[in-house]
Amino acid sequence: MNITFIGSGYVGLVSGIIMGYLGHNVTCLDNDEVKISKLNKQILPIYEAKLDEYLKQALEANRLKFTNIYNNELQNAEAIFITVGTPSKESGEADLKYVYDAIDKVSEHINKDCLIVIKSTVPPDSCSNIIAYLKSKGFSFNVASNPEFLREGSAVEDFLYPDRIVVGVNNKESEEILRKIYAPLIEQGAKFVVTDLVTSELIKYASNSFLATKIAFINEMADLCEKIGGNIEDLSKGVGLDQRIGQNFLNAGPGFGGSCFPKDILALNNLVENHHIDCKILKAVIKSNKQRPSNMVDKIATLLDGDLKGKNIAVLGLTYKAGTDDVRASPAIEIVKILLNKDVYVKAFDPIGLENAKKNLEHKNLLYLDSVAEACKSVDIIVIATEWLEFKELNWQGIYDLVKFPIVIDLRNIIDNEAMKKIGFRYYAVGSKLDVIPAKAGIHYKAR
């Protein structure tokens, strides 16, 4: 089928490339001329495992092209996917200005039988409002909802092997077009969930908010384990092996971040408040997660006798999770900001996200470095803030020889505690008791 994606950000780009790989004729349209120019040279603006391979295959098969021009070629499209951003307003409400801008532009060019598919995350009733908006301008296009459930870092696999494909429609014609588009995935067993427009839109918000709730809950259980001597890793396993609960999103850490969870739970909370529903769970999760980076800094301070001023701290990992270069709403970045406000000197490293971090945060006391060794040299403490595999596989003996004080606080619980202790590190994970030994007790340190 002939498909166009409006917006070549994370969702539009991954979806467009894989749709081209699956055999559709795909056009990805974006206002950013520089981005489009790079894409035509096979230069991806995002990091996503294996995406470059599928980009190459789709281009070589002549099933994918990139443009920044809205023109009458759009008349050939059988479906237009809107995949633009929906950032949060100050109130927490989703801002749909980019969605409506895209609708205005495509409606002037597409044919009357073209299906407009809203893949951007939008509040319930958005599709119905778009239909009414189009009718007010003299258009009668079918509009469908098709939320995405891609996880950054594993988006290619998520698209090719989805848990489910959700579509919201108000007529059979729209459903049949979407079934045809997703036929390659349905044929291999993907569940195709058909519902109404409002429910489809709400499924995305409810899914992300529920997952965010799991993360906030396990983080608070980690705090309890820290106080009473429990083992958060065993607790997560023991709880998660219950099939009613599942093990995913039960990893204690510095909180959730990224472009979806924080934004979507705020939008859902705004929605329920607008309908005069007091959803205490959502408010509690938002509050808990907002406090989490500060709580992590408090733990760091505790390990340094409560005095952070003037300390040199290595922060390993800046992206909100491993497998992506995305630093949006990253807990690691928030932790760095708090440390800088406390007159700490921060030396930061990330294997993929350094450039995005530099665009996001600059400070006279912040150094971005190109290796773990450079970041750890002569520091008072090492903070592991993102769960990159390379941190787990580091030559920690070599790092021990570089640091001023051999203290590691692992906010992702990825390092082997006993192995670190054998080397000589004082190692602390989230959920472990902080048995504080004053830094001035030199017998526990090898001052550099």
UniProtKB/Swiss-Prot annotation:
The Gene Ontology biological process terms listed for this entry are: polysaccharide biosynthetic process; UDP-glucuronate biosynthetic process
Q: Which residues bind substrate?
A: 148-152, 204, 208, 249-253, 257, 321
Q: SMART domains, from UniProt? A: UDPG_MGDP_dh_C
**Gene3D superfamilies, per this entry?**
Cytochrome c1, transmembrane anchor, C-terminal, NAD(P)-binding Rossmann-like Domain
Stretches assigned to coiled coil: none
Q: What's its EC? A: 1.1.1.22
Enzyme class, top EC level, equals: oxidoreductase
**InterPro entries given for it?**
6-PGluconate_DH-like_C_sf, NAD(P)-bd_dom_sf, UDP-Glc/GDP-Man, UDP-Glc/GDP-Man_DH_C, UDP-Glc/GDP-Man_DH_C_sf, UDP-Glc/GDP-Man_DH_dimer, UDP-Glc/GDP-Man_DH_N, UDPglc_DH_bac
Keyword terms: NAD, Oxidoreductase
Q: Which residues of this UniProt protein bind NAD(+)?
A: 2-19, 30, 35, 121, 152, 263, 328
Pathway involvement? Nucleotide-sugar biosynthesis; UDP-alpha-D-glucuronate biosynthesis; UDP-alpha-D-glucuronate from UDP-alpha-D-glucose: step 1/1
Q: List, from the UniProt record, the residues annotated as the active site of this protein.
A: 260
Give the range the annotation lists for the signal sequence.
none
GO molecular function term, any single one: UDP-glucose 6-dehydrogenase activity
Q: Does the keyword Oxidoreductase apply?
A: yes
Show the catalytic activity. Answer: UDP-alpha-D-glucose + 2 NAD(+) + H2O = UDP-alpha-D-glucuronate + 2 NADH + 3 H(+)
Q: Which family does it belong to?
A: Belongs to the UDP-glucose/GDP-mannose dehydrogenase family.
Per its record, how is this protein called by name?
Answer: UDP-glucose 6-dehydrogenase
Origin species, per record, is Rickettsia felis (strain ATCC VR-1525 / URRWXCal2)
